Amino acid sequence: MAESMKGMHRTHRCTELSAANVGEKVTVMGWVQKSRNKGGIIFVDLRDRSGILQIIFEGKDIDEAGFAKAEKLRSEYVIAVTGIVESRGGQVNENLATGAIEIRANDIRVLSESETPPFPIEENSKTKEELRLKYRYLDLRRPDIQKNLIMRSKVATLIRQFLSDEGFLEIETPILNKSTPEGARDYLVPSRVHPGEFYALPQSPQLFKQLLMVSGYDRYFQIAKCFRDEDLRADRQPEFTQVDMELSFVDVDDVIEVNERLLKKMFKETIGVEVSLPIQRMTYKEAMDRFGSDKPDTRFGMELTDVTEVVKVCGFGVFTGAIENGGSVRGINAKGCGQMPRKKIDALVNFAKDFGAKGLAYIQLQDDGNVKSSFAKFMTEDEMKALIDAMGGEKGDLLLFAADKNKVVFDVLGNLRLELAKQLDIIPKDKFNFLWVTEFPLFEWSEEENRYTAMHHPFTMPMEEDLDKLDTDPGSVRAKAYDIILNGNEIGGGSVRIHQDDIQEKMFEKLGFTKEEAYSQFGFLMTAFKYGVPPHAGLAYGFDRLVMLMAGVDSIREVIAFPKVKDASCLMCNAPSPVAKNQLEELGIELTEEAEEELSEGGAEESAE
């Protein structure tokens, strides 16, 4: 039966005690990690969020009732213990931060009993993630998860302090917003008082932070909840946290400079990693040409080589055909892989096909000097030699080629480069490589919609030297946009914003909006722009992803207290869930027959379980 802690006051967390406290009377509280009865002496490992501390219960120190309670302790019981801190002498436990001491108990209260947990509460659990997430409140007790969330809290506190010291104001923006196009799918919230109308949950505070600059607030930041109704993967969630900032009277270099100092401080003070400044910069074009990606992992080489000029006149129709159709031929050199078995090469070909390749051409430069190739019979000896030389090929190398439209070639080789690096285990795990990628295209062409779409968003400023191309060649216009990359992950991105209403109107026009449509969606912003707008720019970090990389884990679910799974559901509280019919009627919502059937089938399955 649970006891009250009335009259007891916790004096320390477990790992706040050390040899300096020997002889003191203390009170600690927490969960029983494990209990061992050694015939008259009971050893209990007590756990709280700080760590573990050993407690000793012995008849000579505690009354009979207290010892009887200690005998009944089980894992995850919540207890309060008062006792004397003692040195463990020569029996130090090097595995514990408190391994040099223990507490000899003279009072105990059982504050709460526990059933046997569905999995052990221990570090590096092998328990299936589905079970862990169903009982997330137990999973959150595990030391490695607690470590991640404590780090998350420290990083958030550091960011707040740094930006406040830099003159930023923390200002909250609305959660219930107007739905606007040009982004991912919105989460919609029906309005009861405006039947048939909907709010949208924010995908970012973009418009409001720009309005704050119009309002004269100069430097704004917010650690904001954002929402996107999209398919999930390891580093995505339907609700996510963004470190959002905006600055007035600045250009690209100003935003980069303050964020470099923020990153340096953040990594040094939380995980002890030195970030060298200035961080390397690379244009979008260079990143794509060298790495096939706008978020390149620069911890290893294996860069792409453009061999279009070398093979534009050759006997291999796949190469020449791609070039004639406006594409290119590029390759990567997998050093030391010349002896790779055919089965593994075939697997790489299939991998390339997943990213749009029709195939993958290869040359094996074997250790004995033999050359094996999927296309050598179509090439002359001189053509093959020129191609191998262009790739820097040597004995023992495997050369892999893609020939297609540039978009496909980059996608295929960029992903193949990463896959090979993982297979060869050549990516240094303890290295943190930062990179700014700049000068993105302002637009990208959507074959599906047969129009230009904004690569970032419709409020991104074109580079001044490209403004005259907006009418004549929009596809070649570069944006004053920048992403910050860490080890092949985009951890943040931003841009200089358009602050002239004529350029903003031109941007909407190029995106296929009529003037009426633009004002219908963004009229409040465009009206605000008529009242004096400072030049402004900003940046936002994906906070969950940033902490994931700092913590060295593979999924952002490991750094979020209560995450969703891939179908955007919560396994712990079963959200989303059906709601009462009267709630829907109040909102003027009626379910389709198909939805009704799915709900009734789901209910039948649940009752069967």
List the predicted regions and their residue ranges.
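Class II aminoacyl-tRNA synthetase catalytic cores and aaRS-like
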Residues: 1-609
